[in-house]
C-alpha cells in the first residue's frame, strides 16, 4: 500500500473507531491501515474506541499493534485508559490493561490525572476496583 493510500486508510480507521464499526476497523487493518496513525486533530483510533467504550474495537486495534499508552490529540485528549476510566467503561479498561496499558500513567498534557483518579471522580467504583487490582496506586495530593 502506497503512502497516500495508507494515510487515507488511517483517516477512515479513526472514523470507523468513532462509529464503533468493528467490521470496518477489521477490514482497514487487514488492508494495512496503521493502528496508531492519528487524524488531523491528533486523535488516535484507540483513543476514539476507548472514549466510546468500544472494547471490541480496542481489542482489534491492540492486536494490530496500537500502543496503549499513546496520548491522543497531541496530548490534549489524554490516554485511551484515562478516557475509558473517565466514563466508567470497565470492559474497555480491562481490554486496555490486558493490552499493556499502564494503570499509573497520568495524562501529560491534559489534567495530569491518572486513570484511577478519573475513575474515582466519575464516580465509577467498579472501574476503580479493576484499576487497583491491576496495580494502580492512589496518589497522595501535594500540600
Model-inferred region functions:
Residues 1-15, 99, 118-143:
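Ankyrin-repeat-protein effector appendages
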Residues 6-15, 38-44, 71-80, 106-114, ...:
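Ankyrin-repeat boundary/"N-cap" motif
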Residues 21-29, 54-63, 89-98, 124-133:
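Ankyrin repeat structural motif
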Residues 72, 78, 85, 90-98, ...:
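Short, solvent-exposed interaction modules
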Amino acid at each position: 500500500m502506497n503512502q497516500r493510500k495508507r494515510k487515507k486508510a488511517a483517516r477512515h480507521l479513526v472514523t470507523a473507531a468513532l462509529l464503533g464499526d468493528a467490521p470496518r476497523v477489521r477490514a482497514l487493518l487487514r488492508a494495512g491501515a496503521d493502528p496508531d496513525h492519528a487524524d488531523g486533530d491528533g486523535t488516535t483510533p484507540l483513543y476514539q474506541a476507548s472514549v466510546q467504550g468500544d472494547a471490541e474495537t480496542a481489542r482489534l486495534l491492540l492486536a494490530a499493534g496500537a500502543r496503549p499508552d499513546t496520548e491522543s490529540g497531541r496530548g490534549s485528549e489524554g490516554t485511551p485508559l484515562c478516557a475509558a476510566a473517565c466514563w466508567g467503561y470497565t470492559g474497555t479498561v480491562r481490554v486496555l490493561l490486558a493490552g499493556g496499558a499502564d494503570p499509573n500513567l497520568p495524562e501529560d498534557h491534559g489534567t495530569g490525572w491518572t486513570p484511577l483518579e478519573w475513575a474515582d471522580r466519575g464516580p465509577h467504583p467498579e472501574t476503580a476496583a479493576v484499576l487497583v487490582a491491576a496495580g494502580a496506586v492512589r496518589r497522595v495530593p501535594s500540600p
